[in-house]
């Protein structure tokens, strides 16, 4: 048998996958730390007891208790809620449902969350970027100039990694610009830290608005992998066509329903209050630390700061077991590190380590 045209397994893969640089999640980047402040997780574990013992049966595609509890919490109808394996799956579902590979494009505004780009690339959909303005708000003219052929626009508010809210009037302008042309996805992964800024009340006005949510941040359930997509029923029905038949395991659905009970939501709000208090403590301390050039305002559970020698600071803390998130390679974030708000003890360790840095 001739082997002249034999391809390696890698050669058999799609070209865009061979060339793909995967998203560098906090866990992929690794480290041997004992102070993990690089993934915007809640710093302490929350305990739940499993109540469902039907693991011999397949779960519901969209568990009723989870959907109803989340709809009540978010102030929308159950028909406007889809639950998935984290908000990351929601990103992928929207692209798969609305974008033709090789024809349509997505658009996002760096510096922002990296999975919009990676998800589009794996599916073979063009990625367009319109960098944010100097104040990290939307460049509406730039977006308008790039809408031809764009099917989905991703906006993260509060934005990761910068921490600020997108101007609501700019969001309205964007929704008007895209009406009848493109889907606008508002990523609200951190909205529990500034609930007054949610766009859920806008769903009735904008049939092309999609909102992403998660239990990974304020609900302290990053290990659960449970996220939500909020949209009008027509959009949800389209997403249900492309979602896996059993996206949530029975234990995940069980814990999610408990987390979204009245007691669970009250506990989440207590965690938010605790995080906001610790965030202010960390901001004040960073502002009085010599190696810190600037601390940016935050509406989230993390702080972005610019350092005089960020690479040295990052490595020095890494070597001490304090793992931060390096944002140097993001557009306009030269010298910046992102610090998750931890416990008081963790925050103090960060400050002590930073104040020991040479300037």
Swiss-Prot record:
Reaction it catalyzes: L-histidinol phosphate + 2-oxoglutarate = 3-(imidazol-4-yl)-2-oxopropyl phosphate + L-glutamate
Residue(s) carrying N6-(pyridoxal phosphate)lysine: 217
Pathway, per record: Amino-acid biosynthesis; L-histidine biosynthesis; L-histidine from 5-phospho-alpha-D-ribose 1-diphosphate: step 7/9
Entry's Gene Ontology BP terms: L-histidine biosynthetic process
Key words of the record: Amino-acid biosynthesis, Aminotransferase, Histidine biosynthesis, Pyridoxal phosphate, Transferase
Cofactor(s) this protein cannot do without: pyridoxal 5'-phosphate
Gene Ontology MF terms: histidinol-phosphate transaminase activity; pyridoxal phosphate binding
A matching Pfam family: Aminotran_1_2
Enzyme Commission code: 2.6.1.9
Record-linked PANTHER family: HISTIDINOL-PHOSPHATE AMINOTRANSFERASE (PTHR42885:SF2), HISTIDINOL-PHOSPHATE AMINOTRANSFERASE-RELATED (PTHR42885)
Protein family per UniProt: Belongs to the class-II pyridoxal-phosphate-dependent aminotransferase family. Histidinol-phosphate aminotransferase subfamily.
Subunit structure: Homodimer.
This protein's name: Histidinol-phosphate aminotransferase
Organism: Salmonella paratyphi C (strain RKS4594)
UniProt lineage: Bacteria, Pseudomonadati, Pseudomonadota, Gammaproteobacteria, Enterobacterales
